Amino acid sequence: MAYPMQLGFQDATSPIMEELLHFHDHTLMIVFLISSLVLYIISLMLTTKLTHTSTMDAQEVETIWTILPAIILILIALPSLRILYMMDEINNPSLTVKTMGHQWYWSYEYTDYEDLSFDSYMIPTSELKPGELRLLEVDNRVVLPMEMTIRMLVSSEDVLHSWAVPSLGLKTDAIPGRLNQTTLMSTRPGLYYGQCSEICGSNHSFMPIVLELVPLKYFEKWSASML
């Protein structure tokens, strides 16, 4: 999860988020090189005593500054398109969970089970236990099995919301009357925190999301205890 004064992304815990981090580093390197080149050229222009007032055209330079940016854009666009297609890919999910946004809490339904659903509210600051996180803890966590493909169906009962968990590279809009879907898979167990990422009213900041990723055998025990 995030920590105070953090500058980078949260640690990736899903293949998609790992791809997004690699793409971010790849793009940032290109932007840094371009910025350095532009600053270098500007510094030369400001410090040189040479002038070229008689130069009318320079086709070679024009060709270079047309082709080079096109190549750079292609180098950025190709990996970006690859990740976009990966994010929309659905691979026979092992479990489906329906998420509904409300003002101002989330409700979850495990559609593969006959009667497994619950609401998830933020725990008020006055009721937190030692070690728990302010504005991020909930009374009912979403328990999911790790290393399995899980489909999340996301919608809303009232206004626009957005279901987002940064460590998993997830952000899906919850739109009234529309059912969006996304897939997730965690490569390691743990608690992963998120929040509503669409301004939805006065208590928008009080809609945390907590995923608890556990091995399959522990998930089966939990689901049996909830039925």
Curated annotation (Swiss-Prot):
Residues 1-14, 88-227 are mitochondrial intermembrane. The modification Phosphotyrosine is found at Y218. Keywords: Copper, Electron transport, Magnesium, Membrane, Metal-binding, Mitochondrion, Mitochondrion inner membrane, Phosphoprotein, Respiratory chain, Translocase, Transmembrane, Transmembrane helix, Transport. This is Cytochrome c oxidase subunit 2. Mg(2+) binds at E198. Its cofactor is Cu cation. Cu cation A2 binds at C196, E198, C200, H204. GO terms for biological process: ATP synthesis coupled electron transport. It comes from the Eukaryota. The chain crosses the membrane at residues 15-45, 60-87. It is a multi-pass membrane protein. Its main location: mitochondrion. It is an enzyme of class 7 (translocase). Signal peptide: none annotated. InterPro entries: CcO_II, CcO_II-like_C, CcO_II_C, Copper_CuA, Cupredoxin, Cyt_c_oxidase_su2, Cyt_c_oxidase_su2_TM_dom, Cyt_c_oxidase_su2_TM_sf. Residues 46-59 are mitochondrial matrix. Belongs to the cytochrome c oxidase subunit 2 family. GO terms for cellular component: mitochondrial inner membrane; respiratory chain complex IV. Component of the cytochrome c oxidase, the last enzyme in the mitochondrial electron transport chain which drives oxidative phosphorylation. The respiratory chain contains 3 multisubunit complexes succinate dehydrogenase (complex II, CII), ubiquinol-cytochrome c oxidoreductase (cytochrome b-c1 complex, complex III, CIII) and cytochrome c oxidase (complex IV, CIV), that cooperate to transfer electrons derived from NADH and succinate to molecular oxygen, creating an electrochemical gradient over the inner membrane that drives transmembrane transport and the ATP synthase. Cu cation A1 binds at H161, C196, C200, M207. SUPFAM superfamilies: Cupredoxins (SSF49503), Cytochrome c oxidase subunit II-like, transmembrane region (SSF81464). Pfam families: COX2, COX2_TM. It catalyses: 4 Fe(II)-[cytochrome c] + O2 + 8 H(+)(in) = 4 Fe(III)-[cytochrome c] + 2 H2O + 4 H(+)(out). PANTHER family: CYTOCHROME C OXIDASE SUBUNIT 2, CYTOCHROME C OXIDASE, SUBUNIT II. Component of the cytochrome c oxidase (complex IV, CIV), a multisubunit enzyme composed of 14 subunits. The complex is composed of a catalytic core of 3 subunits MT-CO1, MT-CO2 and MT-CO3, encoded in the mitochondrial DNA, and 11 supernumerary subunits COX4I, COX5A, COX5B, COX6A, COX6B, COX6C, COX7A, COX7B, COX7C, COX8 and NDUFA4, which are encoded in the nuclear genome.
